[in-house]
Each structure stands twice: as C-alpha cells, then as structure tokens.
Amino acid sequence: MSAFQFAQIGVIRSPYKEKFAVPRQPGLVKHGGGELHLVAPYNQADAVRGLENFSHLWILFVFHQTMEGGWRPTVRPPRLGGNARMGVFATRSTFRPNPIGMSLVELKGIRCQKDQVILELGSLDLVDGTPVVDIKPYLPFAEALPDASASYAQQAPLAGMNVSFTPETEAQLLTLEKRDRKSVV
C-alpha cells in the first residue's frame, strides 16, 4: 500500500471556533463567511492568478479535530436521524481512513498584500484553524449533474423548523421585544 504526504497550503479563518457550532453544509448560514489565508511558499499572487474569474471554489481540507479518533467502517449520518448505520464511503463523515474533506464555497474576493494572499469566502462549513491542502475552481458545466441521485440526501434539508412556545415564554418574548424595540423571534 502506498503512503502519500501533503503540504498544508493554507488555513481557514471562520466564525466557528468549535466543531459543534459548524453548519453541516456551506450555504446554510448566510452571514457565516470566512477567509482562507495561504501560507508560505504558496502565499504568492501568481499562485491565485485567474482565480478571481470563478464564483465558487472547492476547498480540500483535513478533518484535523477528529483524525486522531481513527476511521470507522460504518457511521450514523445526521440526515438519517443518527439511528441508521451506513458505510463510511456512503457518507460525508469526518471519521474516514484519510481525514480529507471538501467544501464548495463562494469566492467573494482575493486580497494580496505584501506576503499575504487571502481568499474572502462566502458561507462555509469549516471550523476556525482548519488546515487546507488544495483549492480548485468549481466548473458548473462539469460538476452540476441534474440527473444525479443521492440516496438519503436527494433533497436539501428543510430550511426551518416549527417552534412552539408556552404562553409564559411568549409573554416574556413580547416584553423583550417592547423593551428592545426589535423582534426577538
């Protein structure tokens, strides 16, 4: 069996400081953007020349917070309620033989200043400090497959959930709204 070694090309800066705060997919939190800071020797403007012409990027990264836990042949995907087991290769679980993840994110801009190259990213699903091993432009003609099927994740999850409040809680929320003059819910 072959072994491979990869260099870290950058690090993610995001509002999510721990893995339990991270959305399950990019795009779920509108204001959850971040940055990708390239590290030496990859922090050169030439390395990103032409990238500004793409709206979205694939970010390949390391699941650094779960890699020491090792891999598992079966996992319980959250989309199945955490009750049914699936083979790890049929999921996007972090507990993989090679702890490599990929995320499709919007590229909002590129800043090159002195020895820094920073990619400004839209909504993402990565914890702050995530090591990045590669970036690739998203190619809509090749990667958007309208006839593809996806087993248990064929449709996007519901955007919201109904929440019911007790009359006492509703009264407390109304008091807060009046006091602060803005909607609480």
Describe these PLM feature segments:
Residues 2-8, 95-105:
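Short coil-to-beta-strand transition motifs
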Residues 17, 110-116:
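Short, conserved beta-turn/loop elements at beta-strand boundaries and strand-helix junctions
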Residues 72-95, 101-103:
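Short acidic (Asp/Glu) patches
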Residues 114-124:
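Short, solvent-exposed secondary-structure boundary/capping segments
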Residues 122-153:
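Flexible glycine-rich active-site/ligand-binding loops centered on an Asp-His dyad
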Residues 184-185:
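Conserved small/polar residues in nucleotide/adenosyl-binding loops
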